[in-house]
């Protein structure tokens, strides 16, 4: 019973991250999708951000799909792609093409992957 609830919790975390990756980077190269997942994982590890994925993703003013409700709609319908799911799994397993970056944007500075700049 305990392992079932743990597995369900892990699936919930994976689905939440896959949904965010799809919303933020679904039209980007696979490496860019993993990089968005890595930003979330980096924030969880950072003392400057909350300690859980849910708190990081839904922190006020951080990820627009979380604020607009788009993320929740995608998640409710499992509307993310297989690539977004795989990117989430890879990021959760430690894949990180961006080092210690905590942000990404379409303008400004940083390491470019697809249309996003990671910094």
Regions found by a protein language model. Name each.
Residues 1-9, 13:
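Single conserved hydrophobic/aromatic residue that forms the stacking wall/gate
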Residues 10, 14-119:
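Bacterial extracytoplasmic/cell-wall-associated proteins, especially those involved in peptidoglycan
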């Amino acid at each position: 019973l305990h392992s079932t609830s743990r597995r369900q919790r892990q699936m919930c975390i994976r689905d939440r991250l896959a949904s965010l990756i799809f919303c933020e980077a679904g039209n980007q190269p696979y490496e860019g999708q993993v990089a968005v997942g890595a930003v979330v994982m980096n924030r969880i590890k950072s003392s400057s951000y909350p300690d859980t994925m849910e708190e990081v993703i839904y922190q006020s003013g951080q990820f627009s799909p979380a604020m607009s409700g788009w993320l929740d709609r995608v998640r409710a319908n499992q509307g993310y792609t297989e690539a977004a799911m795989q990117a989430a799994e890879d990021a959760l397993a430690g894949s990180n093409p961006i080092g210690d970056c905590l942000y990404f944007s379409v303008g400004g500075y940083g390491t470019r992957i697809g249309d996003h700049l990671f910094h």
